Amino acid sequence: MAMSSYMVNSKYVDPKFPPCEEYLQGGYLGEQGADYYGSGAQGADFQPSGLYPRPDFGEQPFGGGGPGPGSALPARGHGQEPSGPGSHYGAPGERCPAPPPAPLPGARACSQPTGPKQPPPGTALKQPAVVYPWMKKVHVNSVNPNYTGGEPKRSRTAYTRQQVLELEKEFHFNRYLTRRRRIEIAHTLCLSERQIKIWFQNRRMKWKKDHKLPNTKGRSSSSSSCSSSAAPGQHLQPMAKDHHTDLTTL
């Protein structure tokens, strides 16, 4: 009851704060800042007690928040940490050291020396195909010497009119060619020896068919078969005669 009556009867006046608009205009803050900086300059000349030695460098007031106007700033020594809210953030010009950047995962892979790519262990290396001598085409002179694959299917040779005319002329004089003459004709007509040989074989068969001549190969085979069949009968007759004479003598 005594406290409440004292508060009621006292001459306490509520503080009058300026409205927010005055803060935005800067008049109130500007006057207070001038008073604060003036008191800060006055506090720099203040000599503290002899507990801590005075440093050689001059002291500068902080621009940030600090003690109120009229208070002196203590000198900073080597073992004393500055007090106040601004002491936690350091000097205005100083910056916190940035942390070192974390190494990227791809940077390590690039720094390592890259060697030749190794095939996976499950896959085997392809071996070159083996080409045996019988798989090569060597019986034709006009074949590509660099070709090492299998023998392709032979195509029918198309002779030109000039080649056929020269071959017919040669066949009219000689139905059978020697090796030397065959080589000469092959070089003259730009053909191979095998092509010349096959053409002459076919031309001889056609000539025999046109003249109705018997095939020499068929006649020789038939004559040999007849001779072989007649030989056993000749040997059987003397044996039968000898057997008959033996029976009569008995």
UniProtKB/Swiss-Prot annotation:
GO terms for molecular function: DNA-binding transcription activator activity, RNA polymerase II-specific; RNA polymerase II transcription regulatory region sequence-specific DNA binding. PROSITE patterns: ANTENNAPEDIA (PS00032), HOMEOBOX_1 (PS00027), HOMEOBOX_2 (PS50071). Residues 105-115, 220-229 have a biased composition (Low complexity). GO terms for cellular component: cell junction; nucleoplasm. This is Homeobox protein Hox-D4. A motif (Antp-type hexapeptide) lies at residues 131-136. The lineage of its organism: Eukaryota, Metazoa, Chordata, Craniata, Vertebrata. It holds the Pfam family Homeodomain.
